[in-house]
Amino acid sequence: MNDTIHATDAAHAPHSTQQHSMRALAIAAIGVVFGDIGTSPLYSLKEAFSPAHGIPLTEGSILGVISLLFWAIILVVGIKYLLFVMRADNNGEGGVLALMALSLRPLDSKTRVAGALMALGIFGACMFYGDAVITPAISVMSAVEGLEIATPHLSHLVLPITIVILIALFWIQRHGTALVGKLFGPIMVLWFVAIAALGVYHIVRVPGIMAAINPYYAASFMADHLLQAYVVLGSVVLVLTGAEALYADMGHFGAKPIRIAAYGLVMPSLVLNYFGQGALLIQNPKAIENPFFLLAPEWGLLPLVILSTVATVIASQAVISGAYSLTSQAIQLGYVPRMKVLHTSELAIGQIYVPVVNWLLLFVILCIVIGFKSSDNLAAAYGIAVTATMVITTVLAAVVMVKVWNWNRLLVGAIIAVFLAVDLGFFGANLLKVAQGGWLPLGIGALLFFLLMTWYKGRHIVKERTAADGIPLEPFLQGLLAHPPHRVSGTAIYLTGNDKLVPVSLLHNLKHNKVLHERTIFLTFVTRDIPYVRDDKRQTSRDAGGGLYIVRAEYGFNETPDVKAVLEEFGRTHDMTFELMDTSFFLARETVVPTHLPGMSIWRERVFAWMHQNAAKPTDFFSIPANRVVELGTKIEI
């Protein structure tokens, strides 16, 4: 968020300052955005020529596969994401949930089209988690496997070292990564320069590899090998893992720095390295054992293993941080139960830590590493989540082009037809790998999709039941002031999800305690379909008379509601002061009771009730002092 503001401000700064700011943002983006796609050379080409595919290591096949890799990067990364998808920003924010919110804005939320788009967006988010458990596993494992080439007698330590690195990576998350994060950019710049240099060294020795730029070789390879070539597409897509991060992280850096980094360093370095690996294979087909590490001279192997390991840790960090951010967005948009979200930096708003997500990710990743044992075995599981998200992004972007930008439908149809042909081709090729490991991200995505849709549907039913039984707030307050109960000193704040209805906690308090505080505030938090809400637009309040106030605080889906900040702003507006330790917070503790009423099947209602019971307490989520909270129970039948 702060980086984007600086990028905008730079436009008004002197030219040298603007260049420096843009360069700094581009380097920072290289450290965060491009880690995943930048470490793909470790395993992509090796997997494309897997013995299971039955593709002979002839010069023609090598040129064909390298040509496929090259044009996949150009079409998907260079054109689709960088030129088209990144235009579809939601107030500067990218990512599948932000894109979904943008595509839904011009539509009636009750239509089937809106429902289908919402489901697509949520499924895309769920598939990200399927990718998030594989990226750290395959990236770190493939880097550590370089030991098998550098020092073969240490090959038995690959698995233990991988596990130790992953545990350490997740263990430090709670302390934040701001300190070491400053090194990510320069280290990844070194990584891209190194892999480019390794590629150039071998291209110079076999310059004929540059013929693969001609798409004829890709087309010829597909025509000659047909089904085998289509299976290879499932491995070619590994060069695109992380492409979605270009769009998802746009809100942190801005589109221009990401484009500068991609076109200026990342894409050229990746292309040079892949062409270098191809040149090496033409010279020495036996190098398919590990074409990336065998690019290096013998003296450079161990340094390359170390640099690769650091680069894959950085790539994993980007995915982990992305999982935290996506979870936080989903919580605010109402698709996920409340979870404890901790801010690990006072300066960077995006630096957050979600303990539940952290330890669940580590558990699943360790199970994957121990179960699959090598990056070769895991490669089959990689790709299906990425390609599914790519297809969903294309569909949602098409809706934005037509409904939000009002582009010509024929033009949009032509553009999207090309993108979908590529995306669906890759997705179909990955479906062939379901039995070999593709079931893993699909299963994770499907399970999460079921849970998220159950939560969303359940919350909708709860709101309907509450609204049906609710009492309008304004007339109730007028009646309350006309016949007031006993007033007691102090401030009471009633947190409520609907500022039009009387909070259940107030009804219970009046029923049992028969008192009303001299200063009573009804506080409602609302999440908008934009990432951030301006401070001057955040809060509205109205005086209902008699010391009663109705306050509505709006937040973007990238923000965390802040009770203390809301009360401070309200106090400034109404010339009041608040002390949290002298304020009583009244909350309704809802107990969901599954029934046979219309809504969901009884077993889904039980799942929802379990999720509801295990959601983080409002006191934890809103950072309210626990000893200042009064929870009043209420049962809701669904």
Curated annotation (Swiss-Prot):
Keyword Transmembrane helix part of the UniProt annotation: yes
Keywords (A to Z) from UniProt: Cell inner membrane, Cell membrane, Ion transport, Membrane, Potassium, Potassium transport, Symport, Transmembrane, Transmembrane helix, Transport
Molecular-function annotations in GO: potassium ion transmembrane transporter activity; symporter activity
GO cellular component: plasma membrane
UniProt topology in membrane: Multi-pass membrane protein
Pfam families: K_trans, K_trans_C
Chief site of localization: membrane
TM ranges: 25-45, 65-85, 114-134, 152-172, 184-204, 226-246, 262-282, 291-311, 352-372, 382-402, 410-430, 434-454
The keyword Transit peptide belongs to this UniProt entry's keyword annotation: no
Annotated localization: Cell inner membrane
Protein family (similarity comment): Belongs to the HAK/KUP transporter (TC 2.A.72) family.
Function: Transport of potassium into the cell. Likely operates as a K(+):H(+) symporter.
Protein name, UniProt field: Probable potassium transport system protein Kup
Gene this chain is encoded by: kup
